[in-house]
Amino acid sequence: MRIAGAIKFVVAVALFLLTFYVISQVFEIKSYTNLGNIFVRSAIDTVAHPTTKAPRYRCGISKVCPEKHFAFKIASGAANVVGPKICVDDNILMSGVKNNVGRGINTALVNGKTGALIETTYHDLWGGEVGPFIEFLKKIPDGTIVLMATYDDGATKLNDDARKRISELGSTLINVLAFRDNWVFVGGKGIKTKSPFEQHIKNNKDTNKYEGWPEVVEMEGCIPQKLNE
């Protein structure tokens, strides 16, 4: 009897181990199958939805410009610390890195037909005089694209004559530009209408981002190429 009982016990253990083995093998197969399905789905998703970088447009603006237009991006200075930046057709014309900006109104002149840079300059309208700035404005050739950005203060020495000449370039906000306001503008010599490219942030102690200065004002867009004589 003892031998028969031992045999039954051994058979029971063997059946248990066999059952466990079969179940584990089936589970393992299913696991591999599931993992395979996951990898297959992942590969299909990668092919169907490939990762692509967002396109970069000229001057880093948010859209592509139409044909016969120049992309531009312009930013005023930040307080009296960081200078303005002017980019046209993917070329940085003025910036602190280029070391060609300064306190006052910073100006870049661009050929309206080719987009080529004509001149960059700045006029100190806080510690300097307005006379040289007026003479500069008088000599801008017709058909020239004019880009302007303030840094620190661009208004203290502005007089009616200077404001009138900037207004003739297409500005509508130059007459309200005041001490330490931030302002950016794109216009043209000989323009027949007011420019759509102008932004202004007033110096206001209650809303200023920096102590004594408003936040930086930025603007981007597409300037139509001058086609007619």
Swiss-Prot record:
Query: Which is a Pfam family this sequence falls into?
Result: ILEI
CC per GO annotation: extracellular space
**Which keywords does the record carry?**
Developmental protein, Disulfide bond, Lectin, Secreted, Signal
- InterPro entries linked: FAM3, ILEI/PANDER_dom, ILEI_FAM3C
In this protein, which residues make up the domain named GG-type lectin?
68-226
- What pairs make up the disulfide bonds? 59-87, 65-222
Protein localization: Secreted
Q: Which N-terminal residues, if any, form the signal peptide?
A: 1-24
Q: In which tissues is it expressed?
A: Expressed in the retinal ganglion cell layer.
Does the record's keyword annotation contain Phosphoprotein?
no
Molecular functions (GO terms): carbohydrate binding
Q: Which family does it belong to?
A: Belongs to the FAM3 family.
Q: What does this protein do?
A: Involved in retinal laminar formation.
Return the protein name.
Protein FAM3C
Q: Which organism is it from?
A: Xenopus laevis (African clawed frog)
